[in-house]
Amino acid sequence: MGFKIRNFTGDPFAIATVSFGLIAWIVALAGAAASSQGSFPHFTWWGIAYQIVIILVITVLYLNNNIELYKFTLVGLVSIGFIYTTNSTNNLVYNSSSSGNLCCAAGCILLSILNLIWILYFGGHPESPTNQFIDSFSSNKYANEYIGRSSVLKTEPFDDQQGFNSAASKRFTSTGISLPQENVSQMSQTNTHSQQQQHSTNAANASNATSYFPLTQLHGLENSSQDMMGSAPRDLTQNTNTNSSGTKRNTLYTDSEGGTGITFRYKAKALYSYDANPDDINEISFIKDEILDVDDVDGKWWQARRANGQVGICPSNYVKLIDT
């Protein structure tokens, strides 16, 4: 998500409604300031102050690109503002003939119209015709492809021996251990053999696979990083991943499966934009309305593939299955 000006400027609905709201609020404030306070309804000042807070909150949510997460909250807040502005309009129009009061009433009428529009939009389902029509003008619909982070988030399998040798050497060198080249070659050959064996077995046997590297080939080096660095290394023998809360979550695919041998039977549409956790290489980022190929749709995390071929897992409450 993140605070970005283009999140706001790229949405014509946000620019139009917030700008309209600021103009209407200034008109109401100017009328209230010019009115005789003896005949001015004092509670209207609270309504004017409340309205500018709502406008600022909506602006900040658009700038952070998380307006979708607070739509239901905004419906309640804007509904309260709608009551304030309509009540103030009634008191200003019928209980006073002051030009300042009438100017403030005009601003409150404009704010009431704005609040009604926001209630209809934020209260509508993202798949409703009105919301779909409004969102179709947003340039953020297929923007922000997370190019800058794709190299970090994208999981690429080691399909060749040279790539595996390089990665294995870097992994053990970073812990201060010099790994002989023949051991690295032996490990890469074992990895190639395990990949071939995995593709030749059925899905049931593949799901029960518990070893990416045979422990006998590591010669006790599997715990070297923990001993020397004081932190637990990634568990290479279990198909699990540790999230930020410290609990292990089942990974929906292994490193050797990324990009090959996976059948995606369903398609899903992203209801909201999602930024992957940079500490979890298995998660993928996507944007609102993006179409994803998904499988293993049981549970809170689904296996997914983006249009650019990036494979990972996505939260199920951010996407919706669609008919193909």
From Swiss-Prot:
Protein's membrane topology: Multi-pass membrane protein
Segments of this protein annotated with the region Disordered: 183-204, 223-254
InterPro entries for this protein: SH3-like_dom_sf, SH3_domain, Sho1_SH3
Residues bearing attached sugar chains per UniProt: 87, 95
Cytoplasmic side of membrane: 1-12, 64-65, 123-324
Transmembrane region(s): 13-33, 43-63, 66-86, 102-122
UniProt feature, compositional bias: Polar residues: 236-254
Keywords (A to Z) from UniProt: Cell membrane, Glycoprotein, Membrane, SH3 domain, Stress response, Transmembrane, Transmembrane helix
SMART domains: SH3
Main location: membrane
Subcellular location, record wording: Cell membrane
Extracellular-facing ranges: 34-42, 87-101
One annotated GO biological process: regulation of actin filament polymerization
PROSITE patterns: SH3
Matches recorded under Pfam families: SH3_1
Top-rank taxon: Eukaryota
Limits of the SH3 domain: 263-324
GO CC field: plasma membrane
Record's compositionally biased regions (Low complexity): 185-204
Physiological role: Plasma membrane osmosensor that activates the high osmolarity glycerol (HOG) MAPK signaling pathway in response to high osmolarity.
Subunit: Forms homooligomers.
Family label: Belongs to the SHO1 family.
Protein's name in the database: High osmolarity signaling protein SHO1
Organism: Lodderomyces elongisporus (strain ATCC 11503 / CBS 2605 / JCM 1781 / NBRC 1676 / NRRL YB-4239)
